Amino acid sequence: MCIRDRVKKLRWNPSVVHCHGWFSAVVPIYLKHMFADDPVFRDVKIAVSLYDDAFPGELDAGFRAKVEHEGVQDENLKILDNSSYQNLMRFVMDYADGIVLASEGVDAALAEYARRSGKPVLEYQAPEAEGFDNYNKFYEEL
């Protein structure tokens, strides 16, 4: 059973879905396109955390086609023709409502892209910082 089905079964309507790292990259576009009319996810806000977790090279050449095959039709998918880490994370940020710079080593160009996006950005929080309060304030901004 996938998380989407479990959320529905529990009759829980999330207010925020927080995606961590590149591995969760398709979640924002699925929520914004495929589940946009679903009452459970219609008003959900999406936060994306960026880490120093770049992968070398590119994802499979058919990655864009796989996303399209799932029913996503969007002109922004063309950035995935070159599915490098940087392009994938730019794509993810375009569908997020807020962005977290979750480690000190986040790619500088991606951090700048986040800051210029006009979306709420939570800068890196050192482990000793009052992180929970800062995250709560960030979520309230979404």
Language model region names:
Residues 1-142:
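Catalytic cores of nucleotide-sugar-dependent glycosyltransferases that transfer UDP/GDP/TDP-activated
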